[in-house]
């Protein structure tokens, strides 16, 4: 079982007087910066010119170029998209790190897969809240917190663990609990969850169910409701209390169908395929493929995305959601 740390386990003064640079001001960046500031950390924000720059300034932060922020900071937290981190690190962060600094991430992808190679004389750790930035911020302001993971990759100063816990405490995570892990474990489990279950697995299952009903002659609108729309109701029940809460809450007919039909859909063959997915994550095959795809301009990514956006389930869904303004997205979806 994971070791869990709380507020009482933190050396609160280990980052006292240290300057923290938050590189990036998106979902996680704004939450980290604001929570740290509210906990009396000395925070600056490092960005390239754009909307985020203006937003950070509006929120009252001193904003600098990434290079300037990295040069003045003792702790540099990189909260950029995975695919952008290596370029920004090599161009603007690496040469500005000083001995004894801390280089921090919220996901281990680039360090674990050797896209970022930190100097040997800096501490390297990750602090990864297990929730989106808006939730990290909202729960903090309400006196609560989102749990987080932390891991130490390199302990150059002998105090990397203490710094990681102090940072986690600064964003409020120790109120809920901070679980110790490794860069390898965090990266590989995160990627597996996304690919086999949360994104890849669920979308493939939803589409397969929809197509099965439509191919059998059922109206696509009903297929959409049964295989996609109602998924949120079930996931919310699991989120609140696990599988047992979902099974307690649905009808006995639905629960019996779960027991007798679920194992026929997700079979041992499915688990073997999941094992293959995990192996490709572990041996770096997935990372190499994604890095190459990004460097080539993402031709397959964009082609698949465009095709998926025109699947019948999406066409029908867009029409049905016009009937349900309460589920309309708050942000633009579709092409990236």
Swiss-Prot record:
Cysteine pairs forming cystine bridges in this chain are: none
Pathway it belongs to?
Amino-acid biosynthesis; L-isoleucine biosynthesis; L-isoleucine from 2-oxobutanoate: step 2/4; Amino-acid biosynthesis; L-valine biosynthesis; L-valine from pyruvate: step 2/4
Q: Where is the KARI N-terminal Rossmann domain?
A: 2-181
The Swiss-Prot or TrEMBL record lists the needed cofactor(s) as: Mg(2+)
The protein's annotated catalytic reaction(s) are: (2R)-2,3-dihydroxy-3-methylbutanoate + NADP(+) = (2S)-2-acetolactate + NADPH + H(+); (2R,3R)-2,3-dihydroxy-3-methylpentanoate + NADP(+) = (S)-2-ethyl-2-hydroxy-3-oxobutanoate + NADPH + H(+)
PROSITE patterns membership: KARI_C, KARI_N
Binding-site residues, Mg(2+) 1: 190, 194
Keyword annotations of the record: Amino-acid biosynthesis, Branched-chain amino acid biosynthesis, Magnesium, Metal-binding, NADP, Oxidoreductase
MF terms per GO, please? ketol-acid reductoisomerase activity; magnesium ion binding; NADP binding
Q: For this entry, list what GO says about its biological process.
A: isoleucine biosynthetic process; L-valine biosynthetic process
Which superkingdom does the taxonomy of this entry point to? Answer: Bacteria
Q: What class of enzyme is it?
A: oxidoreductase
Sites binding NADP(+) sit at 25-28, 48, 52, 82-85, 133
The UniProt entry annotates the active site at 107
Q: What is its EC number?
A: 1.1.1.86
Q: Where does Mg(2+) 2 bind?
A: 190, 226, 230
**Residues noted as binding substrate in the record, renumbered to the chain:** 251
Q: Name one Pfam family in it.
A: KARI_C
Q: Which family does it belong to?
A: Belongs to the ketol-acid reductoisomerase family.
What's the stated role of this polypeptide?
Involved in the biosynthesis of branched-chain amino acids (BCAA). Catalyzes an alkyl-migration followed by a ketol-acid reduction of (S)-2-acetolactate (S2AL) to yield (R)-2,3-dihydroxy-isovalerate. In the isomerase reaction, S2AL is rearranged via a Mg-dependent methyl migration to produce 3-hydroxy-3-methyl-2-ketobutyrate (HMKB). In the reductase reaction, this 2-ketoacid undergoes a metal-dependent reduction by NADPH to yield (R)-2,3-dihydroxy-isovalerate.
Q: Which NCBIfam families match?
A: ilvC, PRK05479.1, PRK13403.1
- This protein's name: Ketol-acid reductoisomerase (NADP(+))
Instruction: Provide the species name.
Output: Bacillus cytotoxicus (strain DSM 22905 / CIP 110041 / 391-98 / NVH 391-98)
Report which gene this protein is encoded by: ilvC
């Amino acid at each position: 079982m994971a070791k869990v740390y709380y507020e009482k386990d933190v050396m609160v003064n280990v980052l006292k007087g240290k300057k923290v640079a938050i590189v990036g001001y998106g979902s996680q960046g704004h939450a980290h910066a604001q929570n740290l500031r509210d906990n009396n950390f000395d925070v600056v924000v490092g960005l390239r010119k754009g909307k985020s720059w203006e937003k950070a300034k509006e929120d009252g932060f001193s904003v600098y170029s990434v290079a300037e922020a990295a040069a003045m900071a003792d702790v540099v937290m990189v909260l950029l998209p995975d695919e952008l981190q290596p370029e920004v690190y090599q161009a603007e962060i690496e040469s500005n790190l000083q001995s004894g600094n801390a280089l921090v991430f919220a996901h281990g992808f680039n360090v674990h897969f050797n896209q970022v190679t930190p100097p040997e004389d800096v501490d390297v750790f990750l602090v990864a809240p297990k929730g989106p930035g808006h939730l990290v911020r909202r729960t903090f302001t309400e006196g609560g917190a989102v749990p987080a993971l932390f891991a130490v990759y390199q302990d150059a100063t002998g105090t990397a663990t203490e710094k990681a816990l102090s940072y986690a405490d600064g964003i409020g995570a120790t109120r809920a609990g901070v679980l110790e892990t490794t860069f390898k474990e965090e990266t590989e489990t995160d990627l597996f969850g996304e690919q086999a279950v949360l994104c890849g697995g669920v979308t493939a299952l939803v589409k397969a169910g929809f197509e099965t009903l439509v191919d059998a002659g059922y109206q696509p609108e009903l297929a959409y409701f049964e295989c996609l729309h109602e998924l949120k109701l079930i996931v919310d029940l699991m989120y609140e209390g696990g599988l047992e809460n979902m099974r307690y809450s649905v009808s006995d007919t639905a629960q019996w169908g779960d027991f007798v039909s679920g194992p026929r859909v997700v079979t041992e063959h499915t688990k073997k395929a999941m094992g293959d997915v995990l192996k490709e994550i572990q041996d770096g095959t997935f990372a190499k493929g994604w890095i190459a795809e990004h460097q080539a301009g993402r031709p397959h990514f964009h082609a698949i995305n465009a095709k998926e956006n025109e699947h019948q389930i999406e066409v029908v869904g867009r029409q049905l959601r016009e009937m349900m303004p309460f589920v309309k997205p708050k942000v633009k979806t579709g092409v990236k």
